[in-house]
Swiss-Prot record:
Intravirion side: 1-14
Subunit details: Interacts with protein OPG161. Interacts with protein OPG164. Interacts with protein OPG190.
UniProt domain C-type lectin: residue ranges: 54-163
Pfam family, one: Lectin_C
Family stated for the protein in its record: Belongs to the orthopoxvirus OPG162 protein family.
Disulphide bond pairs: C75-C162, C141-C154
Keyword Cell membrane set for record: no
This protein's name: Protein OPG162
Parts of the chain on the Virion surface side: 38-168
Main location class: virion
A GO cellular-component term linked to this record: host cell Golgi apparatus
Transmembrane regions listed in the UniProt entry: 15-37
Annotated membrane topology: Single-pass type II membrane protein
Amino acid sequence: MKSLNRQTVSRFKKLSVPAAIMMILSTIISGIGTFLHYKEELMPSACANGWIQYDKHCYLDTNIKMSTDNTVYQCRKLRARLPRPDTRHLRVLFSIFYKDYWVSLKKTNNKWLDINNDKDIDISKLTNFKQLNSTTDAEACYIYKSGKLVKTVCKSTQSVLCVKRFYK
């Protein structure tokens, strides 16, 4: 095998530095492109597309208006539920979506229920207990409107917001 003279070796050295730089840049750009292409698989979001993430919960404005029965069904289809009346997130949700929306509080036969699961609710633990306790109707459903729970007819149509915890 022939040995290379000094000039040839010098030329190889001069050419190898730019080639090495190009290879490094190419590798970095390729890595960035791969990351961007597979970012959903590499770094999954806690909430699906369209859902808004806030304090370990995901919220979805369905942009539809329904009665309470249909609302519960719609949220269940999405593996979610209606916002509870005792959550501290109600004001934040109102400021984000700026809509009146159903909450999971219903009065039926003078019993207070969570319509997500039909379990009894102790309304004395709710912040607006006095306002709710003054309700004389045998049946009423509630929406969150401008900072407070407001009684409405259960068959009326109101905006639907669904909520679920991360990764469910």
